[in-house]
């Protein structure tokens, strides 16, 4: 049983999970992952979810059957997804292309779509119902690389949820795969419009390795976090429409309001509120890591159709006390500095660091990672039922927040941010956020120009 909100109770009935295999024979081979793919920080499962309304023109068609068949067709081209990961020497990950298949679950829920989606959306609240964690499937090695659940609602709408082994692809690579499935559901024949490209050697470490950058996101730090910040975590989502973004911008000096991107403004606000909520030692160093793609960078020519990881998490390091007490401009300049570090050369430096340092985990102490998924295309995947009402991240992690696109009941476009914090910290976070998104009276800004200097 699931409850969302507390007054809403619904039941999901699932059939036994099955393995969907490629629709035709595929090569049996070993394929190495890149040195960006197999870093420790990507050895986890990431879920995304899409919701679709009933469509009269597809009456009589079963989304479960349509997607299951199209999935098999797509796996014939993306056959590494049907294999299993193994480790080679020095923990090097590679795919054993066994064609064992991906996990697929058919389900029905006695609820209507509009009961789950309203002025905002909080998929993490009911994700366990719409994406069942099949026992024994959650591992990185020797487990299915994809888990998919298609859930029909009694209104005729339905949900498509998928869990990806992150070492295989980033979200843009996943969208490329989902687009191929969507093409087959809409009757396409032959090869995908964008043929998949493996070529993981493209982001292999150089010989000899060359690390010209300081990678703050991988610095190992002694954990002095208060015990209260290590207790049980709670998940919430927050909607930021034009009104909320305007309110946050009003906390900035005039010259920053029109020149700073929504991502910069929102991320600075969240970082500041989160830092305050965690009640950290003012002298403690904290990091903001902005997940950034290398696709489109002039010094990194990513092959068209490449679906591996092409992302890094460049970070800025500042003092918690300065983030909490300085004007919002201070945190925002830190965000901008982190973003500006991302280049193709920076990504190659990360690959070289992985091999040189034994694939270290990103810093987990005082770090906040944000991943903007508003433009990756999850909200455009059309399986024949039109674009999803929502297509985006399904759950946050303790150190990681995701941004997704969402249109509320008023038709207002905005951003949904998924947050995961200890319960007490979440309450403080909400209080801090109210200060930032409430009415703010404009007045003379007595801020002095702020120069952000990383504190190492």
From Swiss-Prot:
Tissue distribution: Expressed in fruit.
InterPro entries named among the record's database cross-references: CAT-like_dom_sf, Plant_acyltransferase
Keyword ATP-binding carried by entry: no
Domain of life the protein comes from: Eukaryota
Keywords: Acyltransferase, Transferase
Top-tier EC class: transferase
Induction: Induced by ethylene in ripe fruits.
Enzyme Commission identifier(s): 2.3.1.-
GO annotation, biological process: alcohol metabolic process; fruit ripening, climacteric; response to ethylene
GO molecular function, one term: acyltransferase activity
Active site (record annotation): 166 (proton acceptor), 382 (proton acceptor)
Reactions the enzyme catalyzes: 3-(methylsulfanyl)propanoyl-CoA + butan-1-ol = butyl 3-(methylsulfanyl)propanoate + CoA; ethanol + benzoyl-CoA = ethyl benzoate + CoA; butan-1-ol + benzoyl-CoA = butyl benzoate + CoA; 2-(methylsulfanyl)acetyl-CoA + butan-1-ol = butyl 2-(methylsulfanyl)acetate + CoA
UniProt family annotation: Belongs to the plant acyltransferase family.
Record's function text: Involved in the biosynthesis of volatile esters which confer kiwifruit flavor. Alcohol acyl transferase that can use a wide range of alcohols as substrate to produce esters. Exhibits benzoyl-CoA:alcohol O-acyltransferase activity.
Protein name: Alcohol acyltransferase 1
Native source species: Actinidia deliciosa (Kiwi)
Protein encoded by which gene: AT1
